Regions:
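GNAT-family acyltransferases
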Residues: 1-68, 85, 89, 123, ...
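Acyl-donor (CoA/ACP) binding surface of acyl/acetyltransferases
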Residues: 33-156, 231-309
Length: 309
């Protein structure tokens, strides 16, 4: 996943085309390419690449889009089609890809398809005289099947349950996508802060936290800083949905449950904050009525929801 430089050097492009045309399809030990083209005009928009290894049992993929075609979902659609085609070959058990750790857009493409961040190798990727880190993602056949089976299925029941010894292990193993970690802290940190309470205006906060359960499965975690002498309104401190259960409408249902609970308790406002940036939950919260207050808290944008309206 790189940004395709336009215009690409003609001599290099011709060498790539010549090498690809030697093969009818993905061939072990060789790179093979596909063109992403406009279905109507056939104009070139980008390309896909595949390299088979381990006697054809593993595939490394790459993708690139012309700058003017980015941000339209084309990379996700094309890469999904490629991954599905690869796993349609029964001998392939693993598909992997690598990218620059700062290329959040490319990371999100792989994460949407179920790829797992497997680590980052330091200063391992060279482009001429420039070296950078390389983030590695992988997807196994069994994970691909489970990901597709669970995609877009909305749960029948979503509940907020107390965390007990019986569900603690399920709660502490919840995880977001790797690219989302800059927006929400892991559960273990949240539970630690519930135990060792941070101070707000000189007073310890009052944590309120629950496991998010969808159809009897623990799928997320939510924590509020409750009303206190220094906190006039409940503050949504953490909202985390496990990577395997996102895009199922669960977070929206959690907000609905929180709003109903807080209205019943007489609260008039619900407050939260978020970091801006690619992949930020900002659009999600705005969609649900949270309006920026104009306050910035430690680099995060504060927003509130009026519970009286």
């Amino acid at each position: 996943m790189a940004e395709l430089v336009v215009p690409y050097p003609l001599e290099k492009a011709q060498k790539i085309v010549d090498s690809v045309m030697e093969f009818d399809g993905p061939t072990p030990g060789e790179w093979w390419g596909l063109v992403i083209a406009d279905p109507t005009t056939h104009a070139f928009m980008g390309n896909l690449a595949v390299h088979l290894a381990d006697h054809g049992h593993s595939a490394e993929i790459g993708y690139a889009l012309c700058v003017q075609h980015r941000g339209k979902g084309l990379a996700s659609d094309a890469t999904e089609a490629l991954v599905n085609a690869l796993f349609a070959r029964p001998e392939i058990n693993r598909v992997e890809g690598s990218l620059h750790p700062g290329n959040i857009a490319s990371a999100m493409v792989l994460e949407r398809l179920g790829f797992v961040h497997e680590g980052t190798s330091r200063q391992s990727y060279w482009v001429e005289d420039v070296v950078s880190d390389d983030a590695h993602y992988g997807l196994l056949r069994e994970e691909w099947s489970a990901w597709n089976d669970g995609a877009a299925t909305r749960p029948t029941v979503v509940e907020l349950a107390e965390i007990t010894e019986r569900n603690l292990d399920d709660v502490t193993t919840l995880a977001t996508h790797h690219s989302q970690r800059r927006f929400v802290a892991p559960v273990y940190r949240s539970l630690a802060q519930a135990l060792i309470k941070p101070l707000h205006k000189g007073e310890p906060v009052v944590p309120w936290y629950r496991a998010i359960v969808a159809d009897d499965t623990v799928v997320g975690f939510v924590m509020l800083s409750d009303v206190s002498p220094t906190e006039p309104h409940p503050y949504v401190w953490r909202l985390l949905i496990d990577r395997a259960h996102q895009r199922r409408g669960i977070a929206s249902k959690v907000l609905e449950l929180l709003v109903a609970d807080r209205i019943a308790k007489g609260d008039t406002k619900l407050v939260l904050s978020y970091m801006p940036g690619l992949g930020s939950p900002e659009a999600f919260y705005r969609k649900h009525g949270f309006i920026p207050t104009g306050q910035i808290d430690d680099g995060e944008i504060e927003a509130s929801l009026d519970l009286k309206s």
